[in-house]
From Swiss-Prot:
Record organism: Rhodococcus jostii (strain RHA1)
PROSITE patterns reported in the protein's UniProt record: 2FE2S_FER_1 (PS00197), 2FE2S_FER_2 (PS51085), FAD_FR (PS51384)
Name under which the protein is recorded: Propane 2-monooxygenase, reductase component
Family (UniProt): Belongs to the TmoA/XamoA family.
UniProt subunit comment: The propane 2-monooxygenase multicomponent enzyme system is composed of an electron transfer component and a monooxygenase component interacting with the effector protein PrmD. The electron transfer component is composed of a reductase (PrmB), and the monooxygenase component is formed by a large subunit (PrmA) and a small subunit (PrmC).
UniProt keyword annotations, A-Z: 2Fe-2S, FAD, Flavoprotein, Iron, Iron-sulfur, Metal-binding, Oxidoreductase
Cited SUPFAM superfamilies: 2Fe-2S ferredoxin-like (SSF54292), Ferredoxin reductase-like, C-terminal NADP-linked domain (SSF52343), Riboflavin synthase domain-like (SSF63380)
Annotated stretches, region: Disordered: 1-21
FAD-binding FR-type domain sequence ranges: 128-229
CDD domains: fer2 (cd00207)
Enzyme class: oxidoreductase
GO molecular function annotation: 2 iron, 2 sulfur cluster binding; metal ion binding; oxidoreductase activity
Induction (free text): By propane.
Cofactor note: Binds 1 2Fe-2S cluster.
Length: 370
């Protein structure tokens, strides 16, 4: 069936929270193929948000129209897409009928083909939760990375999968910022986030003088599909930089806790030795795995050399991976960090023939609009 053209409509205010939805908004039915799942969606919400609201966990990443994790194909129906990056869905794809579900609103009953999905996750993922937390620690890790530790208060626990992220709500506003958890469910009394401080950033300002130990912060989540795929056996390559350490550390902690026997090569990119952190714990976690290597990739300076039994290479992280991983086309690759690093890594993987279904990534974008 040929795709229907996308209709253009004025921008909509949206949220998956039931209390913010318009009870009189027109409703439509969405049928997802090839999984044969049907749900209801209102004209006041994005399709991805409607899925979250009804416990359907579609593949997704940024939820801001910047990545392509939720890209799908409209088989039938009228859909409008707004406020998205053409790098995630270009004009030719839009003309063909592709949409990003995180930025798409339905104006009729629709049939949508899911291009990326995990059958085990669709109806069995972790539910989205609203959690009231209390700040228990704010600790600088480097000159621009801060560890923020939150203790769940109401409810008293927070369920998530290693590698996922949460929305942290900025107190006194309706705004939020998204950050990945570095911890696992083995520490139910606290959740740790590793946050990069950007000049002028609103959350960075909070970390400087806006919040203190004992203050409350609301979070919503978990989100994201940057998780270990159970039952997979391929070697794993982790490539990270900056605050991209958080989800990779969560994955590594989880693998150590569960006795995972897969091979892991972990490459972390930084400018100088002073930009490295959590190295001792990473090496300790690695000693509990079957086949683990950690390589620090320093792009600007090797002086002074890092202390301890750590492998260090000179150069950008993607260049180091290219030299050391000739068989990366036969590995599952997890990428997390600044967009230029992720884009360079994706080019490397494409050149080496790594299948797309073996690549999982999160881009940590800076809040330039602040």
């Amino acid at each position: 069936m040929a795709p229907r053209p996308l209709r253009r409509h004025p921008p909509l205010h949206h949220s998956f929270h039931e209390s913010r939805r318009d009870p009189v908004a027109d409703k439509h039915r969405i049928n997802f193929e090839p999984v044969d799942i049907e749900m209801e969606v209102g004209e006041d919400e994005y399709i991805l948000d409607a899925a979250f609201r009804q416990g359907i966990h579609l593949m997704h990443g940024c939820r801001e129209g910047r990545c392509s994790a939720c890209k799908s194909f409209v088989l039938e129906g009228d859909i409008q897409m707004e406020d998205y990056s053409t790098f995630a869905c270009n004009d030719a794809e839009v003309d063909e009928g592709h949409v990003l579900l995180c930025r798409s609103t339905a104006y009729s009953d629709c049939t949508i083909e899911l291009l990326n999905f995990d059958e085990d996750e669709l109806l069995g993922g972790v539910p989205i939760q609203d959690v009231r937390t209390r700040v228990t620690r704010i600790e600088p890790m480097t000159k621009d990375i801060v560890s923020l530790r939150l203790a769940p208060v109401e409810p008293a626990g927070y369920e998530f999968k290693p590698g996922q992220y949460s929305d942290l709500h900025i107190p006194g506003t309706e705004e939020h910022r998204s950050f990945s958890m570095a911890t696992t469910r083995s520490t139910p009394g606290h959740v740790e986030f590793l946050i990069k401080k950007y000049p002028g950033g609103k959350f960075a300002g909070l970390l400087e003088d806006g919040i203190s130990v004992g203050d409350e912060i609301a979070l919503t989540g978990p989100y994201g599909s940057f998780t270990i795929k159970e039952g997979h056996v391929l070697p794993m390559v982790f490539i990270g930089g900056g605050a991209g350490m958080a989800p990779l550390l969560s994955l590594l902690r989880h693998m150590s806790e569960t006795g995972n026997t897969r091979q892991v090569h972990f490459y972390y990119g930084a400018r100088t030795p002073q930009d490295l952190f959590y190295v001792d714990e990473i090496l300790e976690l690695g000693r509990g795995l079957t086949d683990f290597t950690f390589v620090a990739c320093l792009s600007e300076s090797m002086d002074p050399p890092p202390v301890g039994a750590i492998a260090v290479e000179d150069g950008n992280v993607t260049d180091v991976v290219g030299r050391r991983e000739p068989d990366i086309g036969r590995a599952e690759v997890y990428l997390c960090g600044p967009p230029p690093m992720v884009d360079a890594a994706l080019e490397l993987l494409e050149a080496n023939g790594t299948p797309k279904d073996q690549i999982f990534y999160d881009k940590f974008t800076s809040p330039a609009f602040e």
